[in-house]
Amino acid sequence: MQLTLTLSGSSMQLLLLVSNLLLWENMASKPTVLVSTEDLYHRLVEQSHNTFIKAADVYREFDINFAKRSWMKDRILPLCHTASIHVPENREEVHEIKTEDLLRSIINISVSWKEPLKHFVSAVTDLPGASASMRKKAVDMKDKNLIILEGLQKIFNRTQTKVEENENFDYPAWSGLKDLQSSDEDTHLFAIYNLCRCFKSDIHKIDTYLKVLRCRVVFKNEC
């Protein structure tokens, strides 16, 4: 009886091993589903448009409930930290810029917001009087920016015949953390306001130029 039990146990282990091997071979034989460039553009345009709407909502709520009118006369609105990133400023420049150069520009914008948005979420979460909706949208803005960035990088890599190991990207540094963490309420709120204002502007750029690129790449400029 004891020998029979031992053999049964060994047989069971062998059966499980074979089953696992067959399962692994079956999974390995299935090709990874590759999202087409066209579908990536469609998804990214949808994501960027929805993110812009949320950014506009957050900006509007902050402007109504927290912004101070005295800022308009007492403070000078600083340039956004992404101001140095070149993007087309008119229809002629849009027509002339290469696809990979425009992709590079909006990738630079998206990357430059990774760090600021982390701190923005913390600031909005801790902001007395901020609505639950505002807090949730701030988190969504951060998360969607990362999703958009990932998709942009995939598309960019597909435009290259050979992707260089040290691709020439220029990510502007953000220097607003000190003001954002300031104990002075006015300075702190003004820093949040500028993040709201600048991200709304930048995600609008990303959304606009993604639509330009989709028109060019997917619809062959017939849109």
Swiss-Prot record:
It is found in: Secreted. Keywords: Disulfide bond, Glycoprotein, Hormone, Secreted, Signal. It comes from the Eukaryota. Coiled coil: none annotated. The keyword Lipid metabolism does not apply. GO terms for cellular component: extracellular space. Disulfide bonds join C80-C198, C215-C223. InterPro entries: 4_helix_cytokine-like_core, Somatotropin/Prolactin, Somatotropin_CS. Its main location: secreted. Residues 1-28 form the signal peptide. Glycans are attached at N108, N157. N-glycosylated. SUPFAM superfamilies: 4-helical cytokines (SSF47266). This is Prolactin-3D4. It comes from Rattus norvegicus. The lineage of its organism: Eukaryota, Metazoa, Chordata, Craniata, Vertebrata. The gene is Prl3d4.
